[in-house]
């Protein structure tokens, strides 16, 4: 029999769970600031060409060695709950910048720390935090507008390689390989980075449309040496439904025989007498035919079949449109220059669909990607479809002597890939923090327009913050940051900055030291947004720590195997 729980034990349990700790005003902000500084110190050592690596203990396997800011930020958890709260908010800055731009997380962390530090000082001195925030937001908008006017569009393969090299911490091999991949698959092509199985990095490019479904039966193989089906100029029958009846494929087989062209059937499935007829025709040598299952599931399958139809100039046979494969005509069948099918995947090359229809389909997919309601997963799938239609797919297989080396190099490849995409999308600026230093000159106008003293301090907060990334890059190279930042500021030419690798002043864009505009913009917006909100915090609430020696949580009375059963 189960004993009834006492009310007092339930009260104790609830009270235990609801115990919180609070800190107000200056005390709360000081604790948050300490956490922000701890995280920023760890992340900022990786900044610039002479930045250092960070070694991170992993729960499983070998330790991870990395120079990727967001990886370092995510690895940090602090013991003091209030400090950890500050660190978590700065992690949010790095994560947001990583999601939106894919790079620039270390710079965003340095900016966030600087804005928050200055704001905390000003609030402690009696400034209105809301006015400080208004001033800093106005300054950020002015800086972005200035950078927008001075950015340079990226056009050549050399410039793409330069962007990738900078983001890969000066590794020219990574830059060249990514530029090569982008040249082959186009700006919208999919480039994926995977861990390879050799010592060298490899680039594998698939042009045309590739999907992960192979032949239904090995009887269709035309090249026994390679185990592949290879067709030249085939007809393509596309069906949304399963094909079982011989009547469904008879017209298509006859058309294939008459035109002396191979036939590729892509359907939900092909079985029964339809599959038997296909195999029999193939074995007798009457018709070259192959059946493949359509890729994906549900709506994704429907969309992919639609894409293949647009690419090949065919029609998808579907019950919705009341067109059946048993009535197929030559106009309804698609065609392609060549098709290669293995047991795992199918590649269609040189589809003969209309270029206008193809461009319209790509535009439709782009508009869905741009829609705010589209989820990240859907965007990823749409981006893949767009790549297959417009360019191709490139896979970079990262090689190395050990798991740790491959993991570190893969991080740099992904950073470089994101930075390159951002540069191609929105243009480039002189790198090494140079563009932000030049932007400080326009903040005098913004300061004059500020309606009160506190807003002017907000503008000054941004003015001080945007010099910090360059200062940190220079200091990581062992130079005197403040002196060199002053010299960059005095230099009238927008592109003139300091090359920390060589220790000389130079035209940054000509030297290939560049930052994507999107990365700089998103880093500044994310950092100022979170940091100025942090400064307006008046109360911080955390779960109170457990007293030493007490159990983590009292067991709920009357649970199976616990006291209360008899």
Curated annotation (Swiss-Prot):
GO terms for cellular component: mitochondrial inner membrane; mitochondrial intermembrane space; mitochondrial matrix; post-mRNA release spliceosomal complex. GO terms for molecular function: ATP binding; ATP-dependent protein folding chaperone; protein-folding chaperone binding. It comes from Candida albicans (strain SC5314 / ATCC MYA-2876). Residues 546-566 are annotated as: Disordered. It comes from the Eukaryota. Gene3D superfamilies: GroEL, GroEL-like equatorial domain, TCP-1-like chaperonin intermediate domain. May participate in assembly and/or disassembly of proteins imported into the mitochondrion. HSP60 are ATPases and have affinity for unfolded proteins. This is Heat shock protein 60, mitochondrial. It is found in: Mitochondrion. PROSITE patterns: CHAPERONINS_CPN60 (PS00296). NCBIfam families: GroEL (TIGR02348), PRK00013.1 (NF000592), PRK12849.1 (NF009487), PRK12850.1 (NF009488), PRK12851.1 (NF009489). Belongs to the chaperonin (HSP60) family. One of its GO terms (biological process) is mitochondrion organization. Keywords: ATP-binding, Chaperone, Mitochondrion, Nucleotide-binding, Stress response, Transit peptide.
């Amino acid at each position: 029999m189960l004993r009834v729980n006492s009310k007092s034990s339930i009260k104790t349990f609830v009270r235990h769970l609801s115990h919180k700790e609070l800190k107000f005003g200056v005390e709360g902000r000081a604790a948050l600031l300490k956490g922000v500084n701890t995280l920023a110190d760890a992340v900022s050592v990786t900044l610039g060409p002479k930045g250092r690596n960070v070694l991170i203990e992993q729960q499983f396997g070998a330790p991870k060695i990395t120079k990727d800011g967001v990886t370092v930020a995510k690895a940090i958890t602090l013991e003091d709950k209030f400090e950890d709260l500050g660190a978590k908010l700065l992690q949010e800055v790095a994560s947001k910048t990583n999601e939106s731009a894919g790079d620039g997380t270390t710079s965003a962390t340095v900016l966030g720390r600087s804005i928050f530090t200055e704001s905390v000082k000003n609030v402690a001195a009696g400034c209105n935090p809301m006015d400080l925030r208004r001033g800093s937001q106005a300054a950020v908008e002015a800086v972005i507008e200035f950078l927008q006017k001075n950015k340079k569009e990226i056009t050549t393969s050399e410039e793409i390689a330069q962007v990738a090299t900078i983001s890969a911490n000066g590794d020219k091999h990574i830059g060249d390989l990514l530029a090569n991949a982008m040249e082959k698959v186009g700006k919208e092509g999919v480039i994926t980075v995977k861990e390879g199985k050799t010592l060298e990095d490899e680039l594998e490019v698939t042009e045309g449309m590739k999907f992960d479904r192979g032949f239904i039966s090995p009887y269709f193989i035309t090249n026994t040496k390679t185990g592949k089906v290879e067709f030249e100029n085939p007809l393509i029958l596309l069906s949304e439904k399963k094909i079982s009846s011989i009547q469904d494929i008879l017209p298509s087989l006859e058309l294939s025989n008459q035109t002396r062209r191979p036939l590729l059937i892509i359907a939900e499935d092909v079985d029964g007498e339809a599959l038997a007829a296909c195999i029999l025709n193939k074995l007798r040598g009457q018709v070259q035919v192959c059946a493949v299952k359509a890729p994906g599931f549900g709506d994704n399958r429907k969309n992919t079949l639609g894409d293949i139809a647009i690419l090949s100039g065919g029609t998808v046979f579907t019950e919705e449109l009341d067109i059946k494969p048993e009535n197929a005509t030559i106009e309804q069948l698609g065609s392609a220059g060549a098709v290669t099918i293995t047991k795992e995947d199918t590649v269609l090359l040189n589809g003969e669909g209309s270029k206008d229809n193809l461009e319209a389909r790509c535009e439709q997919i782009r508009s869905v990607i741009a829609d705010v309601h589209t989820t990240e997963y859907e965007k990823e799938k749409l981006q893949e479809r767009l790549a297959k239609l417009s360019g191709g797919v490139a896979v970079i297989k990262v090689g190395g002597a050990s798991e740790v080396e491959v993991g570190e190099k893969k991080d740099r490849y992904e950073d470089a890939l994101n930075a390159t995409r951002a540069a191609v999308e929105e243009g480039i600026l002189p790198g090494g923090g140079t563009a932000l230093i030049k932007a400080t000159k326009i903040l005098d106008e913004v300061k004059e327009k500020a309606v009160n003293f506190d807003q002017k301090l907000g503008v000054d907060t941004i003015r001080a913050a945007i010099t910090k990334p360059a200062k940190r890059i220079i200091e990581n190279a062992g130079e005197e940051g403040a002196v060199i930042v002053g010299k960059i500021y005095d230099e009238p030419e927008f592109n003139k900055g300091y090359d920390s690798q060589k220790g000389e002043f130079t035209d940054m864009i000509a030297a290939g030291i560049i930052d994507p505009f999107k990365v700089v913009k998103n880093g500044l917006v994310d950092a100022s947004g979170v940091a100025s909100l942090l400064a307006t915090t008046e109360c911080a609430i955390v779960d109170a720590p457990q007293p030493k020696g007490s159990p983590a949580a009292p067991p709920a009375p009357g649970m199976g195997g616990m006291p209360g059963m008899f």
